[in-house]
Amino acid sequence: MDDAALLARLVAELDHPNATRLGQALLALISSGELPPGQKLPPIRTVADQLGMSPAAVGQSWTLLRTRGIIETKTRGGTTVIGPPRSQRPQRFSQLNEVVEHTRVDLGRPLPDPRLLPDLGRALAEVGRRSHGLNLSDPPPITPQLREALAGHWPFETDDVVAVHRGIDGVEHALTALVAKGDAVAVEDPTVPRVLDILDRIGARVIPIGWLDDGPDLRELMRAFHSGAKLFVLQPNGHSPTGRSVSDAWLDEAAELVRRSEAHVIEFDNFPLLHPARKTLGVAVPEATVLIEGYSHSHGPDIQVAVMGGPREVIARVEQQIAYSHRWVSRVLQDALAVLLASDEASATVRAAANEYQRRHAQARGW
């Protein structure tokens, strides 16, 4: 397909072109093979003129496709198609699943006890009665009901929030938004295997930061920042696999390191409502903190919704990524989570579950 044919195709398919729709159209053509690897794309200004878009908007489409490894741009060689997105096997996660298949009791993953979960059926019934705006083709990134339910729950002032599919999906989106191939990333050690799989796929250089009694080693973190790391990934609450949480003193010192280094922090917390004290760097450095909260452990694994909050520019990039992939998170599940977060009965159930988990952990430590 030459430039003229490609531009004619885009003009015919895009009635109201914008950065998201243009990127989706190009991704479809690349995935189908109509734009094969090695083909040159027209200059950004040419595409902008033909579609009636600004060069900046076309550039946003190019940037996101380039971030996903679908196209590449060289200073003198223009922009070339690399090929459709490649699905890399998550090696560490696959190994964990293979071990679980031959294990009687799985202690490697913190799965919720179904007997301690709030009633999802009642929440879904309430959503069916009162939710508006379902079955829209272009819904907002987060439903008004869930945004309202989070207003009194989010642990610090943040620019914006967006719904994602579970916690690890949010982590992947945040890493993709902030990390490029070859970047150095400081990561707590140990950490969730999927995080390392995602960084492998991106092509990042991981700098492990070992956990001590009160949090990741701050001397190692300082050395990582000095060596060029501009991002730190950690679980401040209920760290998996150790179950530890950072101390208040650790938060104070770590926040000062983040300020001096001008780095970003990605925090993922799969147990935000199951710990009596929620620890986050976002209270001290909200401008640098991206927090992903998952609710499958407190409200059930069928609540396939997590929420990400952070700086406006990061959330905007994530919203673009979502628009290029699964488009949106189910509004039915978002509103069901909103109902549960606002319910006194569900909240009491979650508090009772938190107490029971703490009792079990204390008992296990005594073995």
Model-derived regions: residue spans:
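N-terminal basic, amphipathic alpha-helical segments
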Residues: 1-128, 323-330, 334, 338-341, ...
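Short strand-turn motif at the edge of the Rossmann-like AdoMet-binding core
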Residues: 75, 237, 269-271, 295
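Residue-level signal for well-ordered alpha-helical positions
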Residues: 84, 177, 244-245, 295, ...
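Short glycine-rich anion-binding loops that position phosphate/pyrophosphate groups of nucleotides
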Residues: 112, 236-239, 297
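Conserved core of the PLP fold type I
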Residues: 133-262, 272-288
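Hydrophobic multi-pass inner-membrane translocation pores used for secretion
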Residues: 217, 244, 259, 264, ...
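PLP-dependent aminotransferase class I/II
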Residues: 291-367
